[in-house]
């Protein structure tokens, strides 16, 4: 009579007979870590690992000195920084611009292929683990991720620029076609391709942390490509994590810089007081950085999160304000055209090349490739956030949500704000007085010019200033925490003073960006972002390769391999031996049988089994029971069955 066994880690039941041969059990226990077959493993969460976190003094010292040295150089010799960065940018655009374009296209294709392949059912967590957030809450958080400083700064400025000065060969400037064409071009830059760059980092971090049990470092994602166990203290690992920190610092500093420019212009308009150059913006960076530091050292994170949630509502309210008091019917009428243009013009826009003449080179350098580089620099920061909120989601759920929910939000925001701006230009000619891009106000001023022409705009302006200030603080605070984690071996609770250090570095870079750009501050932002993002572009490509390799040996994929082989071989054997009259049974096959489900597959190979072998904080082997979900040396570790997973809260 069969007796049931306890549930194995996959959450299903098996049956066994009391007479199971002891030799078979002995072989299994000594062939696999902790006596569990890799196909039966439920996954491993980093929250259930014994990890010794600590400050990586090498990364902190090397990256910190480089950044501080750059800030000092930029403050003392901003013209020299601009000259060097401009020359470097020219080289990057000519010799490596294609890499950014291929990345933006390739990541969309790669993620969609994963989502709709058999790997799409693999969870970013343990087998049977439920998502920490409901679908509605998760969608809302992705929704919120699409709103920020850039939406308000570029929302009116970018579409109007494309309307007056389109991509070479795309459409006639100022025409009917230019209305939807301009908004579609902006949607291309801020839409699915942008979020694919973020999503590859989020997917990789979520998979290696909550499915493979490794710390959430950029280096731990691609470590398997080099054949060794992940080591955060190796030269290669430190180089990768250092590049991630540098990219995040410069990418986020750019957002802080444009935020300060826009707040400064808003303060000047509301107060009637002005100062020469970027003096007000520089002062705002200082004041808001102090606010960020207070947030980091005082432990008021809960209050900041509450304020951030309020800010999301204010941002939605701002979009609703534009929609209601602006040209509502016009906006509704252009939505279908924008969507169709977005889809139909994407191949031409993505295929635009630096080899198509000087005008195209100028457009791509100033816009398309700059944006791909900016999103690369933001990828470590945004990706870590997306991974945290997506624990328990399947790869298919994650990819479809991460690509399309925030993209829909930001495209909608651009259509409303940018569409209103284009409508004002078409009906009143009041934004660019002579109808050319050359007559546009400064980028930081355009939003305020548009707002001033809407009923009630003067009342809304102070609210927008506060909203931008909160976006500044929450962005700087969150990015500093991520950089602090990267420089402390993935510590989920990094030291506050190191977080403060990275916040100061970020502010310093933002100051240098404004100083090097002078009156055209965006020039400094664009140069430095594109240059510093290039090395991390290579890291993103390696991430995709490493992820594909690990998914092929995931417990789910191994089970799927056995299932396919078992069914196919059993069917052939049944037809050969019994014709139409056969049924499937599970039985042990003699060694070397061609019809064995595992024939030709080495389930004891190191690349398949070593990753779930448990160790203590010093890397010494310890015993672990995957059925009970606990360490056996001291009886501590995860509580409850392995399939449930620790909450981590």
Language model: regions and residue ranges:
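Helix-loop-helix module between adjacent transmembrane segments
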Residues: 32, 51-61, 66-75, 108-113, ...
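Membrane-interface loop-to-helix entry segments
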Residues: 62, 93-99, 103-106, 240-248, ...
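Inter-helical loop and helix-membrane interface segments of multi-pass membrane transporters/permeases
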Residues: 42-52, 78-94, 118-134, 154-243, ...
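N-terminal alpha-helical transmembrane segments of multi-pass membrane transport
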Residues: 2-178, 320, 550-551, 605, ...
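Loop-to-transmembrane helix boundary motifs in multi-pass membrane proteins
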Residues: 29, 55-64, 225-241, 276-293, ...
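Long, low-complexity, intrinsically disordered cytosolic termini of multi-pass membrane proteins
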Residues: 1-42, 561-649
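Helix-loop-helix connectors at the membrane interface of multi-pass transporters/channels
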Residues: 44-50, 217-232, 259-282, 315-318, ...
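Transmembrane helix-loop junctions in multi-pass membrane proteins
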Residues: 73-86, 117-121, 156-157, 252-271, ...
């Amino acid at each position: 009579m069969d007796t049931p066994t306890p549930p194995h880690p996959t959450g299903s039941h098996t049956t066994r007979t009391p007479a199971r041969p002891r030799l078979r059990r002995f072989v299994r226990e000594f062939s696999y870590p902790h006596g569990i077959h890799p196909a039966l493993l439920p996954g491993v969460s980093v929250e259930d690992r014994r990890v010794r976190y600590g400050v990586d003094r090498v990364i902190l010292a090397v990256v910190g000195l480089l950044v501080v040295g750059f800030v000092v150089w930029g403050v003392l010799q901003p013209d020299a920084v601009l000259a060097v960065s401009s020359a470097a940018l020219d080289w990057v655009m000519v010799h490596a611009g294609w890499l950014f374009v291929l990345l933006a296209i390739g990541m969309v294709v790669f993620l969609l292929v994963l989502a709709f392949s058999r790997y799409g059912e693999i969870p970013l967590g343990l087998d049977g683990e439920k998502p920490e957030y409901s679908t509605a809450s998760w969608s809302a958080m992705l929704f919120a991720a699409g709103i920020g400083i850039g939406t308000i700064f570029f929302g009116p400025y970018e579409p109007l620029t494309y309307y007056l000065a389109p991509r070479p060969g795309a459409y006639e400037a100022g025409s009917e076609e230019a209305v939807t064409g301009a908004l579609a071009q902006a949607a291309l830059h801020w839409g699915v391709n942008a979020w694919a760059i973020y999503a590859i980092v989020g997917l990789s971090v979520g998979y290696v942390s909550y499915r493979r049990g490794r710390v959430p470092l950029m280096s731990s994602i691609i470590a398997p490509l080099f054949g060794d166990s992940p080591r955060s203290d190796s030269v290669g690992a430190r180089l990768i994590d250092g590049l991630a920190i540098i990219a995040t610092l410069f990418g986020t500093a750019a957002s802080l810089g444009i935020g300060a420019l826009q707040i400064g212009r808003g303060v000047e308009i509301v107060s009637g007081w002005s100062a020469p150059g970027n003096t007000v913006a520089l002062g705002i960076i200082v004041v808001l950085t102090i606010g960020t530091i207070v947030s980091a050292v005082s432990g008021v994170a809960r209050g900041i999160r509450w304020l951030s949630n309020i800010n999301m509502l204010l941002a939605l309210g701002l979009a609703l304000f534009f929609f209601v008091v602006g040209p509502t019917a016009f906006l509704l009428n252009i939505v279908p055209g924008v969507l169709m243009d977005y889809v139909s013009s994407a191949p031409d826009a993505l295929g635009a090349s630096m080899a198509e003449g000087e005008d195209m080179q100028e457009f791509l350098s100033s816009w398309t490739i700059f944006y791909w580089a900016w999103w690369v620099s933001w990828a470590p920061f945004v990706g870590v956030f997306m991974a945290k909120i997506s624990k328990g989601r399947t790869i298919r759920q994650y990819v479809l949500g991460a690509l399309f929910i925030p993209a829909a939000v930001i495209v909608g925001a651009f259509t409303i704000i940018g569409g209103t701006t284009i409508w004002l230009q078409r009906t009143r000619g009041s934004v660019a007085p002579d109808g050319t891009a050359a007559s546009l106000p400064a980028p930081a001023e355009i939003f305020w010019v548009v707002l001033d022409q809407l009923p009630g705009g003067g009342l809304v302006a102070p609210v927008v200033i506060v909203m931008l200030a909160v976006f500044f603080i929450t962005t700087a605070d969150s990015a500093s925490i991520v950089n602090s984690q990267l420089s402390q071996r993935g510590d989920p609770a990094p030291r506050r003073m190191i977080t403060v250090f990275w916040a100061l570095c970020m502010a310093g870079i933002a100051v240098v960006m404004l100083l090097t750009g002078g009156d055209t501050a965006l020039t400094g932002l664009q140069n430095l972002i594109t240059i510093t993002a290039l090395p991390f572009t290579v890291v993103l490509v390696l991430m995709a390769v490493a992820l594909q390799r690990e998914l092929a040996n995931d417990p789910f994929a191994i089970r799927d391999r056995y299932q396919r082989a078992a069914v196919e071989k059993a069917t052939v054997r049944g037809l050969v031996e019994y014709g139409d009259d056969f049924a499937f049974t599970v039985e042990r096959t003699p060694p070397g049988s061609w019809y064995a489900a595992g024939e030709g597959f080495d389930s004891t190979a190191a690349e398949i089994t070593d990753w779930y072998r448990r160790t203590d904080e010093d890397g010494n082997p310890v015993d672990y029971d995957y059925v009970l979900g606990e360490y056996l040396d001291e009886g501590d570790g995860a509580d409850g069955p392995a399939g449930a997973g620790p909450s981590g809260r």
